[in-house]
A protein has these predicted regions:
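An exposed, glycine/acidic-rich loop-and-rim segment of catalytic or binding clefts
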Residues: 1-308
Length: 308
């Protein structure tokens, strides 16, 4: 395992497994294996500076959508910028996705840290990426706050697993419940039982039901849904590779790259449905409040194996 620092951080092992990290958003810029690019990665890295680009970035302090961008904690209110009509998505202007982190290399780890002040609340973030020879990436999140604040982090990597579209990607999620969102604003609404088009309890091609009327009668026109997990694993497979994601988050949000995006990426000339974002999260209906003197700790492990 070796870590090389240039303008970004290149990590590679003896198996041909490579990862590129960036201080911007403490992000995963690219994962490759056997020279196949396994993530949705812009050809021009400068595109990652766009505020509406979340590829591989850390999302927080609050992931997903908040009505009117308003956070209420006890008798205090915190206003986030609404970057969608009537909604703050991924924390708006306060989002970690466009914050520059401080990076430190330590053995087989890259540790990103950032201090943020929101009104009277001081928040410290530690995001640690650990690598090994088994083609695993472990992400540990550690957050502290000087006053109670809503914290719900995730990583927004889009996975392609060497494919140019989601057509040959299959997904397995063990879940009997999901969080239904408003079909117009996409705000989380209520817990409901899994329906057929959202049932991935047995491995299924993502595109099998993507044109189902339930999904198409929805602002996203595809998958943009949170599943309540029965266990701690999600599996994504292509013709060449298998990705296993383990975490201690209770939910996972699946987004199938539904909107046309003119950012040119390495793996596809398509404008949408080029990859799948798998975002482990806490409960989106009852987001956790981090109290003073408490520590927010979560982890995600990505393991990639070749099917050749």
């Amino acid at each position: 395992m070796k870590i090389v620092r240039k303008d970004k951080y290149l990590i590679f092992n003896h198996n041909g497994f490579k990862v590129v990290l960036s201080q911007l958003g403490a992000s995963i810029v690219e994962i490759s294996y056997n020279d196949d690019v396994l993530t949705l990665t812009p050809i021009n890295y400068e595109d990652l500076n766009r505020r509406d680009i979340y590829y591989g970035k850390t999302i927080g302090p609050v992931t997903n959508r908040i009505k009117d961008g308003l956070i209420k904690i006890d008798d205090k209110e915190y206003q986030l910028l609404c970057n969608e009509p009537g909604v703050s998505n991924h924390s708006g202007h306060l989002g970690l996705s466009n914050k520059l982190f401080v990076a430190t290399i330590q053995d087989n780890r890259v540790i990103f840290t950032h201090l943020q002040k929101i009104n009277n609340v001081n928040i410290s973030y530690g995001i640690m990426y650990t690598f090994n020879e088994s083609n695993e990436i472990r992400v540990d999140y550690i957050v502290r706050a000087s006053e109670p604040f809503m914290i719900n982090l995730t990583n927004h990597t889009f996975f392609t697993l060497g494919e140019s579209s989601i057509d040959n990607l299959s997904l397995e999620i063990h879940a009997d419940k999901y969080i239904e969102s408003d079909k117009d604003t996409l705000l989380p609404k209520e817990v409901k039982s899994i329906i057929d088009c959202l049932d991935f309890n047995k491995e299924k091609l993502i595109v099998k039901d993507i044109n189902d009327s339930y999904l198409q009668d929805h602002k996203s026109k595809g998958y943009d849904h949170s599943f309540i997990l029965k266990d701690n694993k999600v599996i994504l497979e292509s013709t060449k590779y298998k990705l296993e994601i383990e975490s201690d988050f209770s939910n996972v949000h699946i987004y199938s790259d539904n909107y046309e995006d003119k950012v040119k990426v390495k793996t596809s000339e398509l404008l949408k449905n080029r990859g799948i974002a798998i975002e482990p999260t806490d409960d989106l209906l009852n987001r956790p409040i981090l109290n003073k003197d408490e520590v927010y700790q979560r982890y995600i492990i990505y393991k990639i194996t070749s099917r050749k």
